[in-house]
Amino acid sequence: MTIGIVGRKSGMTRIFTDDGLSVPVTVIEVDPNRITQVKSVETDGYAAVQVTVGSRRASRVTKAEAGHFAKAQTEAGRGVWELRNEAGEAFEVGGQLTVEAFEAGQKVDVTGTSKGKGFAGTVKRWNFRTQDATHGNSLSHRAPGSIGQCQTPGRVMKGKKMSGHMGAERVTTQNLEVVRVDVERNLLLIKGAVPGAPGGDVFIRPAVKLRNNG
């Protein structure tokens, strides 16, 4: 069992079961997560573990970050992430989290940043239906239609679905199955698609809403 781990999405492929079934999987490269800080309820008000992965050039590390990594006696990574430790597991600064904490068949939640789509209209962004192609409609085929009432309330309600920036948001896909754990190559093979583009950072943790799809 683990509180979670940070990895990088490599892409998608497929593997075959012993019965010859094709299973689509996402390959996630998980370098050892180095623990840079352990937070507790007594000192920080909540229990969490701060980790870093990868490496960064010294010229790209601020003095504050350099001091933080030096205190943890670990190499500066490309970023820091916090993993909540609500179960109260014991961790030490300088330790590592690896793929060995996961096992095949385990259900996980994967969080990442979705692909950015730029400025999108309501048809693409919110799945609105298009208006008539003919019958007097010349300019409003993909227009959203009315966005409110008249003088009462005299404004557009907050949260109204309209055109705007689509994607590039934090997204979590729940209850994905770990198909294979490759300890030698630090890889996790997870059934199905996970949020984000290849090369993006993702956060994997045990599923919070366990569901039996069998």
Curated annotation (Swiss-Prot):
GO terms for biological process: translation. Residues 134-161 are annotated as: Disordered. The modification N5-methylglutamine is found at Q151. It holds the Pfam family Ribosomal_L3. Gene3D superfamilies: 3.30.160.810, Translation factors (2.40.30.10). One of its GO terms (cellular component) is cytosolic large ribosomal subunit. The keyword rRNA-binding applies. The keyword rRNA-binding applies. GO terms for molecular function: rRNA binding; structural constituent of ribosome. It comes from the Bacteria. Keywords: Methylation, Ribonucleoprotein, Ribosomal protein, RNA-binding, rRNA-binding. Methylated by PrmB. Belongs to the universal ribosomal protein uL3 family. Part of the 50S ribosomal subunit. Forms a cluster with proteins L14 and L19. One of the primary rRNA binding proteins, it binds directly near the 3'-end of the 23S rRNA, where it nucleates assembly of the 50S subunit. This is Large ribosomal subunit protein uL3. It comes from Teredinibacter turnerae (strain ATCC 39867 / T7901).
